[in-house]
């Protein structure tokens, strides 16, 4: 997806998906289109749930099939489906690379993984959907450390566009490594979404 498309999607969903989108939404905090400034009236329950599902999907950069698959897995686990869903999404390797401030956006985090720059417990992992377990250590491959994106990360260059590193991650930015110390709690995860509406969306299908 192009930068322009992500910015337009950010405005439509009401959540910034990239740093560029965040800057634009400060100036235009309403959906794109001629009638964007006006509040949408008469949205059906389905439309509200659909929009919330799209917000969650957009923040993790997933295709519909991917999000639906994680939801069905979350339902099979003991506990609340919505909380399980966010926890599972947050433990994806690409999501954690973003949360640890190694990247500026979820799309960049995914590229870093796919391009084989990331090690988990010393082994190369190139699957963004890889589920990191508590106690595992993630670091940048030594040969990749000199690359510009990682030098920016090591200097704390993404701090201006990202929320603080959450408590479930123990990060060493200078060393370009981090450890998932425990499973994340929904209240700690910096995503904007009413997860219950997402659960209701899938439950009604």
Curated annotation (Swiss-Prot):
One example of a Gene Ontology biological process annotation: ribosomal small subunit biogenesis
Annotated Pfam families: Ribosomal_S4 (PF00163), S4 (PF01479)
List GO terms (cellular component aspect).
small ribosomal subunit
Q: Which Gene3D superfamilies match?
A: Ribosomal Protein S4 Delta 41, Chain A, domain 1, RNA-binding S4 domain
The protein's UniProt keywords, in alphabetical order, are: Ribonucleoprotein, Ribosomal protein, RNA-binding, rRNA-binding
Annotated ranges, domain S4 RNA-binding? 91-149
Q: Does the keyword Ribonucleoprotein apply?
A: yes
Q: Which PROSITE patterns match?
A: RIBOSOMAL_S4, S4
UniProt GO molecular function: rRNA binding; structural constituent of ribosome
Matching entries from InterPro entries are given as: Ribosomal_uS4, Ribosomal_uS4_bac-type, Ribosomal_uS4_CS, Ribosomal_uS4_N, S4_RNA-bd, S4_RNA-bd_sf
Function (record text): One of the primary rRNA binding proteins, it binds directly to 16S rRNA where it nucleates assembly of the body of the 30S subunit.
Would you identify the family this protein belongs to, as annotated?
Answer: Belongs to the universal ribosomal protein uS4 family.
Assembly and partners are described as:
Part of the 30S ribosomal subunit. Contacts protein S5. The interaction surface between S4 and S5 is involved in control of translational fidelity.
Q: What is this protein called?
A: Small ribosomal subunit protein uS4
From which source organism is this entry?
Tropheryma whipplei (strain Twist)
Identify the gene encoding this protein: rpsD
């Amino acid at each position: 997806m192009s930068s322009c498309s992500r910015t337009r999607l950010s405005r439509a969903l009401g959540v910034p998906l990239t740093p560029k989108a965040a800057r634009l939404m400060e100036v235009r905090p309403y959906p794109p289109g001629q009638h964007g400034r006006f509040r949408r009236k008469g949205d059906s329950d389905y439309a509200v749930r659909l929009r919330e599902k799209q917000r969650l999907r957009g923040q993790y950069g997933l295709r519909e099939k991917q999000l639906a698959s994680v939801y069905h897995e979350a339902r099979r686990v003991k506990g609340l489906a919505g909380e399980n869903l966010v926890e599972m999404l947050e433990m994806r390797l690409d999501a954690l690379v973003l949360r640890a401030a190694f990247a500026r956006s979820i799309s960049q985090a995914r590229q870093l993984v796919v391009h084989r720059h990331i090690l988990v417990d010393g082994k190369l992992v190139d699957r963004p959907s890889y589920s990191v377990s508590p106690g595992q250590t993630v670091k940048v491959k030594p040969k990749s450390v000199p690359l510009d994106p990682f030098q920016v990360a090591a200097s704390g260059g993404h701090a201006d566009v990202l929320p603080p590193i959450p408590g479930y991650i123990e990060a060493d930015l200078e060393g370009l490594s981090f450890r998932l110390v425990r499973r994340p709690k929904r209240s700690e995860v910096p995503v904007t979404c009413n997860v219950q509406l997402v659960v209701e969306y899938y439950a009604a299908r």
